[in-house]
Structures are given as structure tokens and as C-alpha cells.
Amino acid sequence: MPNPLYRQHIISISDLSREQLECLLQTALKLKAHPRGDLLEGKLIGSCFFEPSTRTRLSFETAVQCLGGKVIGFSDGANTSAKKGETLADTARIISGYTDAIIQRHPKDGAARVAAEFSRVPVINAGDGTNQHPSQTLLDLVTIYETQGRLDKLKIAMAGDLKYGRTVHSLCQALKRWGCEFAFVSPPSLAMPDYITEELDEAGCRYRILGSLEEAAEWADILYMTRVQRERFDEQEFAKIQGKFNLEASMLARAKPNLRVLHPLPRVDEIHPDVDATPHAYYFEQATNGVYARMAILSLVLNEEV
């Protein structure tokens, strides 16, 4: 079967068909079961992080090296010519002349699409502001499939910062293709954006608003927790919402046996450490799946056949 992702930019989940998502999912599972160290042999990847990152940057760079490739780049935009006023378009033009693909994280919404417009090589969005985070979505799909055995018609609860959390936006856009049902738990000021709920309506996916994490845990197959992103608020606003939706082990007492709690990490206090010892906790395994998901993205974008 032809590779539907060869030489493609990976900018937004909404750009990808269900066929492309399934290809990415199955490739990630295959590479997890049977790793290969030759798929990026002779390839040089630009890792361009204008915003702080631990898991995303390190798992992408791990993926490149596990596949036999090499990485150049930076982990702080303050140490680049962007500090001197160089435009993102010019940066993309320059780095695409050095590399076979660019992995980019940027604090500005839409930055990945700008880079893709001016790059001569594929651009992989590692997060652009509050907008999209497609590689996180793929590792979430891998984890959900791994724990539930399917993606079709699952019950997905999302809690915390649903307004600014790019991970939940991308995940809704992906899982609507499998007819999932959603529940949202958040302060009103951090509710899921209208454009996402409108997309769910158009796809015929049901969703509900729940008032507590206990309700969500009892209802869901997956409880996807998010961090209230302090860096996106001033101190006064943050104080009003901090600690409103924090998960503790006691809240999982009526959860179904198959419930898994996921989190894109880092966590602060929204998941108490006592949850870690429950059979429902799966966020550390989820983070590990980031390597395989990103191996799949890089392999498919840079090889005609995998």
C-alpha cells in the first residue's frame, strides 16, 4: 500500500484523514513491537524549539537517534537569530537548507503553518501556542488503543484547562473520526472552545458537561487530565482557578475496571501522587509511547515505504 504521508507536513490533526491516522497508529505499534534502526540512516533532522519542552523534544530526538538519524537544533528561541528580529519564514528557509525535516515548537498559534509555507522540507508541528499538537495526539491514540483494544465509540472525559490545552483540541479532532462520545469537566472560564464543540456537532458526536471528576471517572473509558497552564495567566487569574479540578485516588472508587487516566504531562497538583499506585494510572506509559509515535511520524514522512 502506498505511504499516504510521504513528504507531507504534519501541522494539524484536522489536515489528516482517518486513513493517514490509522497508518500512523499501526506504524507506531509495529515499531514498538519490532524496532528498526535504519529508517533515518543518512538523514539530518532540525529540532527547533522556541518554547520550553522536556518530553516532546527529548522523545523526538530519541526517536531520530533510534531510527539511525542525526539531530541539530536548539531548545530555546532566545539563543537564535529570532532574538535579533529574524522572521519565522526566513528561519524556516535557512534550516530547511540544512536538514531533511524540521521539528518545530513555537509559542505562537499558526507558527507551524508559516514554517511549512516557506520550508523546502517537511515540517512537523511539535506544538504551536494553544493551537495544535499532532504528535501528542498520535501518542494518545496509541495509548488509548493499547489500553482499550479499539478506538471506536469510546467514552472520553477531558478535565482541567480545556480552553488553552492544545492536546485536548487535537484529540477531539482525531477521535471524532471514530464516533467517540465526550464529557468535559472544567471551570467555565476554561471550557472547551466553541469551534471544537461545533466540529463534534458536525461529526454527529455527542458530548456533555459534567460537574465533577467523580462523575467523569464513573462514566468514562478514558479520563484525560490536563494542567492549568500557569504561564498563560497572570497571577490573579491563576489564583482563581488553581486546584479547582484535582484528581485523587478516592475519586476513582466507582470507576470501571478498564478506565485509564491519561495526562500529557507535566503535572503539578491536578493528579495527586496517590493515583499513581492505582490500576487506572497510565500517564507514564503514555509518555513512553511518545518515542514510538514520533518514530512513526518521522519514518513515514521521510520514507516511501516503511
Curated annotation (Swiss-Prot):
GO terms for molecular function: amino acid binding; aspartate carbamoyltransferase activity. Keywords: Pyrimidine biosynthesis, Transferase. GO terms for cellular component: cytosol. GO terms for biological process: 'de novo' pyrimidine nucleobase biosynthetic process; 'de novo' UMP biosynthetic process; amino acid metabolic process. The keyword Transferase applies. Carbamoyl phosphate binds at R55, T56, R105, H133, Q136, L265, P266. Pathway: Pyrimidine metabolism; UMP biosynthesis via de novo pathway; (S)-dihydroorotate from bicarbonate: step 2/3. L-aspartate binds at K84, R166, R227. InterPro entries: Asp/Orn_carbamoyltranf_P-bd (IPR006132), Asp/Orn_carbamoylTrfase (IPR006130), Asp/Orn_carbamoylTrfase_sf (IPR036901), Asp_carbamoyltransf (IPR002082), Asp_carbamoyltransf_Asp/Orn-bd (IPR006131). Coiled coil: none annotated. Its EC number is 2.1.3.2. It catalyses: carbamoyl phosphate + L-aspartate = N-carbamoyl-L-aspartate + phosphate + H(+). It holds the Pfam family OTCace_N. PROSITE patterns: CARBAMOYLTRANSFERASE (PS00097). It is an enzyme of class 2 (transferase). The keyword Transferase applies. Gene3D superfamilies: Aspartate/ornithine carbamoyltransferase. Belongs to the aspartate/ornithine carbamoyltransferase superfamily. ATCase family. Catalyzes the condensation of carbamoyl phosphate and aspartate to form carbamoyl aspartate and inorganic phosphate, the committed step in the de novo pyrimidine nucleotide biosynthesis pathway. PANTHER family: ASPARTATE CARBAMOYLTRANSFERASE (PTHR45753:SF6), ORNITHINE CARBAMOYLTRANSFERASE, MITOCHONDRIAL (PTHR45753). Heterododecamer (2C3:3R2) of six catalytic PyrB chains organized as two trimers (C3), and six regulatory PyrI chains organized as three dimers (R2). This is Aspartate carbamoyltransferase catalytic subunit. It comes from Neisseria meningitidis serogroup C (strain 053442).
